[in-house]
Amino acid sequence: MGRAPCCEKVGIKKGRWTAEEDRTLSDYIQSNGEGSWRSLPKNAGLKRCGKSCRLRWINYLRSDIKRGNITPEEEDVIVKLHSTLGTRWSTIASNLPGRTDNEIKNYWNSHLSRKLHGYFRKPTVANTVENAPPPPKRRPGRTSRSAMKPKFILNPKNHKTPNSFKANKSDIVLPTTTIENGEGDKEDALMVLSSSSLSGAEEPGLGPCGYGDDGDCNPSINGDDGALCLNDDIFDSCFLLDDSHAVHVSSCESNNVKNSEPYGGMSVGHKNIETMADDFVDWDFVWREGQTLWDEKEDLDSVLSRLLDGEEMESEIRQRDSNDFGEPLDIDEENKMAAWLLS
């Protein structure tokens, strides 16, 4: 709904008040009083709005208005009342005789609010800024990129290298047999497990990457020349064994004696094969497969006869080819043939 307008706003004069209008308004109020501000302009013969007449009288034409600047005592009163009443300017003005609410409001917005901003600054902040130590002097020169990068300090892992893995340095060699007539070895060994892979604490057992106690894996597996190299560092970082996983293999040698049997026996000790060896190598299966392959090999005479038969067949094929193409040409005939072809 709202309040009804004070006038029709038709034919109303706007802008600055003239001295004649000020005298007319003052004479009418002094003789008739303020009365109703809605009907006052019409009764006084002013072409002004009732609101404009009221503000002109209260703020400028009253006889009890105090002129001049606001004193420091009045400033203190305004500050105290503003802290309790807020922006209720008319109530503040009632405690300051001769001052209008509009004047107090303008003075607060233009002067006092700016002064109070400096008054209420925390002294601790000002003292901290004033008493701050000077910044340290920088050494001349450019800052390196490494110094500008953020540094992340990581707690190094306790990388323990057990020295308890001790195995006998030995080779497991499948036996080589000798023929009684001394014709030489029948065949090389099928498998040799070098002692370098089971050397001891310096060369721990093999295992898949990440199977170690700490799960670390050596990221670099290349040697100095860029080739793949299985050195001690890779073994140390890939898999480490302790005493509980140590593999002890006893050496085995075949008895190569002239008067011994053609197929000498062999013995592999399984004294201390622990759980780790059983997971990766089934020694019984290796032994059985090797013995089976050994029994299936033919003797030396059959091998030699097969080789001789192959050579005879090749000679027959070459002779047959020469018969099909005729006798080979001598050098003179070949030269003549080449000259005829090039002519």
Swiss-Prot record:
Tissue occurrence: Expressed in seedlings, roots, cotyledons, leaves and apical meristems.
Gene knockout outcome: Accelerated germination, faster hypocotyl and primary root elongation, more lateral and adventitious roots formation, faster development of the inflorescence, and more lateral inflorescences initiation and fruits. The double mutant myb11 myb111 and triple mutant myb11 myb12 myb111 accumulate less flavonols in roots, leaves, stems, inflorescence, and siliques. The double mutant myb11 myb12 is specifically altered in flavonols content of siliques. The triple mutant myb11 myb12 myb111 is impaired in flavonols biosynthesis and exhibits a reduced UV-B tolerance.
Keywords: Developmental protein, DNA-binding, Nucleus, Repeat, Transcription, Transcription regulation
GO MF annotation: an example: DNA-binding transcription factor activity
Localization, UniProt: Nucleus
UniProt KW Cytoplasm keyword: no
GO biological process: flavonol biosynthetic process; negative regulation of cell population proliferation; negative regulation of developmental growth; positive regulation of flavonol biosynthetic process; response to light stimulus; response to UV-B
Region (Disordered): 126-146
Biotechnology: Promotes flavonoid biosynthesis when expressed in tobacco (Nicotiana tabacum) through up-regulation of the biosynthetic genes.
DNA-binding annotation, residue ranges on this chain: 37-61, 89-112
Record-linked InterPro entries: Homeodomain-like_sf, Myb_dom, Myb_TF_plants, SANT/Myb
Gene Ontology cellular-component annotations: nucleus
Domain HTH myb-type stretches: 9-61, 62-116
Function: Modulates overall growth by reducing the proliferation activity of meristematic cells and delaying development. Flavonol-specific transcription activator involved in the regulation of several genes of flavonoid biosynthesis. Activates the expression of CHS, CHI, F3H and FLS1. Confers tolerance to UV-B.
Protein's UniProt name: Transcription factor MYB11
Source organism per UniProt: Arabidopsis thaliana
